[in-house]
Amino acid sequence: MSDEPIFEEEMGETELREEAMNWWQRGYQAQMRQQLDEAIEHYTRSIEIFPTAEAYTFRGWAKSLQGKLDEAIEECIKAIEVDPDYGNPYNDIGAYLIQKGDMRGAIPWLERAFDTNGYECPFYPRFNLGRVYEEFGDLLKAVNLYKEAYDLNPNYKQALLAFRRLQARLN
């Protein structure tokens, strides 16, 4: 085995994916330490090696934490272009639009997140959509969405609290 560095041009798809994942993991670790600029650099390196929906989505999340919501939305759109079945960016766009005060604009994005197969946290878009309908005064729809979110993840206490709060208002 040679001590020569392996250049990306010489790597196969599997190796490129693995290398990109290593950079993504570095980015995630930096983000968890609140080192957002470093995280963005690592996510960017991951994308340069092998673009993935995860890297774009998480780079968007890091940018959102810097208050760059429009850039975060752009990153999520790139993620969807790479993998339309990855659910996180749909929910994230909805959440960023909620933060921007565009409740109506958030609805189709959150609803699309329901229908994706590649989403490990399907309770988030239901909770976020519940927030939208609560804001619009449709408390029955909101309480049902909070309940769905809680049913999908009984450890998601925020959904349980919102469900109980609205249930009490409706009674």
Regions found by a protein language model. Name each.
Residues 3-22, 116-120:
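TPR-adjacent "capping" and linker segments in tetratricopeptide-repeat scaffold/adaptor proteins
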Residues 16-54, 58, 65:
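Alpha-helical segment of the N-proximal tetratricopeptide repeat
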Residues 17, 50-51, 84, 118-120, ...:
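Short coil turns that delineate tetratricopeptide repeat
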Residues 22, 55-56, 89, 123-125, ...:
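TPR alpha-solenoid repeat register
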Residues 32-42, 66-78, 100-115, 136-145, ...:
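Structural signature of tandem alpha-helical TPR/SEL1-like repeats
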Residues 47, 80, 114-116, 150, ...:
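A conserved position within tetratricopeptide repeats
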